[in-house]
Structure formats: structure tokens, C-alpha cells
């Protein structure tokens, strides 16, 4: 017996013309099994520089949950780190769900649901790691209690998520297509709220009469992940480890994911205390892997840094050695010198780049606020093992790691320092006006 088929409309990125494609019908249960089997997100080859500078990709690594009803906003406000009622968050915002101890459970982006049956009426879409979407759905359902809202884990056949970016001067081939899709009321594009100029999220209503965007001729999703890695943007529970990661170490504060002035929410106490009384000594940073010789030269800060970094990309660190081979959580240590505690932990990568949780004053030249320079030395090399245990007969292969602070994060720190200095100056002036001593 031939499998049942259905006809869908397909649009290519260079033209809005529709063509017909045929896909086999697959039940929801089988789709769920397929998603669990397809956990590998990255291709084995590094994308071209053109892909990294402009593109449109379908985010199969992300999934959407619908929350709608009279108590939707009130409920979410009490369980997320950001302020759902802030005017600047009206188009969508980055945030997280924490444990009571202040550890990250899920990092998410929340959008107003303008494409649903009741647009604008207390209806939201929560974007989350696809592998953990069912877990978050159960988490919300467990704490819903008597709150009045509907909760639904959306199938990709209902709503699809795309990401577009364009770092070149002229309009990209996808710009017109996205505009047409939005004008037809089938999609909504919003700037990614985490890092300026990272790109835009495009939420597409797949249940419309024609599917406005399809998989044909799209940029590989690996290009999107490479851009994230080079910019130091962690995403999902493979990089922001659930129940372990701290929000500030995961850059959620500098990626506009935390409102430090909002009311109570789950996990607030430790987060606020760390912000106002502590020092963030570790952060997730982008890393370049290399094997022999001097560390790669990191391009100068500024918007052109990303384009320059693309020239350092390789499909392998060396023949047969890739970032994908490094175990998650592998310790990054100084060459020929064991530290009391490893200054870094590997998270995830592709080709010769990736993300790691790094001690700032050891692995970079960052000077922490109110402290003297750390132990960083530009001549010091760091290594990470590809696996294996200490003392085993076969020593695990090691590759060198060069961590760096991306330009946008330095800009955030500079602005924060200027703001802190201005506040200090104003406090001193106020004390002088009142005839009080300034220490």
C-alpha cells in the first residue's frame, strides 16, 4: 500500500512563486519518535562565509508552547526572570525559568501570539529547546494550579520558527519573501531580543491555506549555530545546563533576559543578591580550537569582528578531530599545569569553534569590577581533552582552546561601567549639597 500523501505549497527564497511538493503523511506519535532520534543539530561541514553573513534557516532545534487565557500574563510574570508587562517587551523578549535556588531550568523567548485564534487577548508563545519542550510543558502544567489559561505544546506542523539575518549592505533574497508572508498575515518577524544585529525570529502559521516558507533552498541550521557560537550566545539545555547553570554566568543578564527591578519570581533571591553583592567570575564565552602553534589572533572589537572571525573557521581542528568530539563538561585547563580547579568547562561546538564556561580573569584579559588584574597571560595556552580517563593506557587526544570576549559584550560592560560611574558621581554631588562628607 502506498503511503498517504498531501499537497503543500512551497516558496523558494529568491521568488514568491509557488510550486507543488508531496510529502508522506506521518502521525504525531511517529513525528515525536523521529524528533528524539534526530538530536544531532549540526552538519559535518562548516558553512560558507556567505551563509554566515546573510541567510534564512528553519530552527528545528526550537519548539513553541501556547499559553492563552485570562491568567496567562499573571502566571508567567511569577515564574520568569523578565518583566512581561514592560513596554519594551511588547514585541517579544528573552527570559528564563529558574529553580527556587536560582538555577536555570529553561531559557526561552516569549512572543505575543498575534497569529492565534484570539490575537492580543492574553495569548503568548514560548520558544524553548525542542528536546525539552515536553518537559517545560509539564513544568507549567504542574504549577498552573487554579490559574485560568490554556496550555498547548504546538506541533511544528502548526507553527514553525525561522531565523533570518543580513550583515551585508544590500537587501537579502529573503527580505521580500518575509515581508510578503507578514503582509499576508501568515507570519510575524521580530528582532532577536538577545544581541543587537543578531537577526530576526520569524514565527510562521503553518495552518494557513498555503505554507509560506518551506525547507527548500534555506540556509543550513548549522550556519545559525556557528553565528551564535562566534557571538557567544548560548541557547538550549546543551549549553545552559538545566538545574546547574546560573543565569548571570549564562549571560542572561547581558542578553536582556533579566529585569532586576520586577517583583517576586521563582529563583529571584539568589539572582538579585549576585547582581548587587557578588562578582560574576565566570561566563559563557566563544572559543576557537587549534592544535599546534600560536593561538589564533582574535580580530579587533567592533561590528566587523564577526566577519573577520569567519576567516578562522575550519571544518576540523586537524584531520579527524572536530569540536563535536569533545564531551560536554570536559575540563579546560592550563597546558602542563593542573589548576586546583579547572578555569573552564567545554559546552558545545562545531568544526573548530564552540562555547565554554570560562573563568574571566584566568582565560581572558578581563579585569573584574573593583579588583586588580587576574592571572591571565597571553602566552598561557589552555587545553581540553577529547575524552578518556586519566591513567588509562591510551591517553586522550587534546586540543588547545582560545577563549575571547565578543565585541557586543564588551560594549555592554562599557555602558554599565559608565552608568555606574555616573550614578556614583551623582551620589557624591547629593552628599556635598547636603553638607555631608564624601568617603
UniProtKB/Swiss-Prot annotation:
GO terms for molecular function: transferase activity. GO terms for biological process: iron-sulfur cluster assembly. The keyword Mitochondrion applies. GO terms for cellular component: mitochondrial matrix. Its main location: mitochondrion. Keywords: Mitochondrion, Transit peptide. It is found in: Mitochondrion matrix. It holds the Pfam family GCV_T. Residues 1-72 form a transit peptide. InterPro entries: GCV_T_N, TrmE/GcvT_dom1, YgfZ/GcvT, YgfZ/GcvT_CS. Belongs to the GcvT family. CAF17/IBA57 subfamily. This is Iron-sulfur cluster assembly factor IBA57 homolog, mitochondrial. The lineage of its organism: Eukaryota, Fungi, Dikarya, Ascomycota, Pezizomycotina.
Amino acid at each position: 500500500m502506498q503511503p498517504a500523501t498531501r499537497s503543500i505549497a512551497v516558496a523558494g527564497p529568491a521568488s514568491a512563486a509557488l510550486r507543488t511538493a508531496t510529502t508522506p503523511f506521518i502521525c504525531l506519535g511517529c513525528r515525536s519518535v523521529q524528533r528524539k532520534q534526530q538530536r544531532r543539530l549540526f552538519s559535518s561541514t562548516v558553512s560558507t562565509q556567505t551563509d554566515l553573513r546573510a541567510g534564512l534557516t528553519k530552527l528545528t532545534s526550537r519548539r513553541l508552547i501556547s499559553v492563552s487565557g485570562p491568567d496567562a500574563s499573571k502566571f508567567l510574570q511569577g515564574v520568569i526572570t523578565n518583566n512581561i508587562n514592560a513596554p519594551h517587551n511588547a514585541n517579544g523578549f528573552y527570559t528564563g525559568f529558574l529553580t527556587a535556588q536560582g538555577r536555570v531550568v529553561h531559557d526561552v523567548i516569549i512572543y505575543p501570539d498575534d497569529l492565534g485564534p484570539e490575537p492580543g487577548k492574553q495569548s503568548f508563545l514560548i520558544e524553548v529547546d525542542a528536546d525539552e519542550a515536553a518537559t517545560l510543558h509539564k513544568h507549567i502544567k504542574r504549577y498552573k494550579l487554579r490559574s485560568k489559561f490554556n496550555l498547548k505544546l504546538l506541533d511544528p506542523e502548526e507553527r514553525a520558527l525561522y531565523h533570518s539575518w543580513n550583515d551585508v549592505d544590500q537587501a537579502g533574497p529573503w527580505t521580500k519573501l518575509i515581508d510578503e508572508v507578514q503582509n499576508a498575515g501568515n507570519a510575524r518577524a521580530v528582532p532577536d531580543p538577545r544581541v543587537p544585529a543578531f537577526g530576526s525570529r520569524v514565527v510562521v502559521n503553518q495552518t494557513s491555506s498555503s505554507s509560506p516558507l518551506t525547507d527548500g533552498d534555506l540556509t543550513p541550521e548549522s550556519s545559525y549555530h556557528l553565528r551564535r557560537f562566534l557571538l557567544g550566545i548560548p541557547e538550549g539545555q546543551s549549553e545552559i545546563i538545566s538545574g546547574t547553570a546560573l543565569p548571570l554566568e549564562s549571560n542572561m543578564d547581558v542578553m536582556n533576559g533579566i529585569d532586576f527591578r520586577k517583583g517576586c519570581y521563582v529563583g529571584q533571591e539568589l539572582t538579585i543578591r549576585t547582581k548587587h553583592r557578588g562578582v560574576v567570575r565566570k561566563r559563557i564565552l566563544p572559543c576557537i580550537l587549534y592544535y599546534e602553534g600560536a593561538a589564533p589572533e582574535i580580530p579587533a572589537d567592533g561590528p566587523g569582528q564577526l566577519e573577520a572571525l569567519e576567516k578562522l573557521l575550519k571544518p576540523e581542528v586537524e584531520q579527524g578531530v572536530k569540536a563535536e568530539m569533545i564531551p560536554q563538561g570536559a575540563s579546560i585547563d592550563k597546558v602542563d599545569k593542573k589548576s586546583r580547579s579547572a578555569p573552564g568547562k567545554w559546552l558545545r561546538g562545531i568544526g573548530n569553534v564552540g562555547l565554554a564556561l570560562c573563568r574571566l580573569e584566568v582565560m581572558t584579559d578581563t579585569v573584574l569590577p573593583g579588583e586588580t588584574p587576574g592571572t591571565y597571560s597571553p602566552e598561557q595556552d589552555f587545553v581540553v581533552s577529547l575524552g578518556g580517563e586519566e591513567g588509562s593506557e591510551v591517553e586522550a587526544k587534546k586540543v588547545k582552546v582560545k577563549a575571547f570576549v565578543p565585541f557586543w559584550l564588551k560594549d555592554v560592560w562599557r555602558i554599565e561601567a559608565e552608568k555606574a560611574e555616573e550614578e556614583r558621581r551623582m551620589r557624591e554631588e547629593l552628599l556635598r549639597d547636603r553638607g555631608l562628607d564624601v568617603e
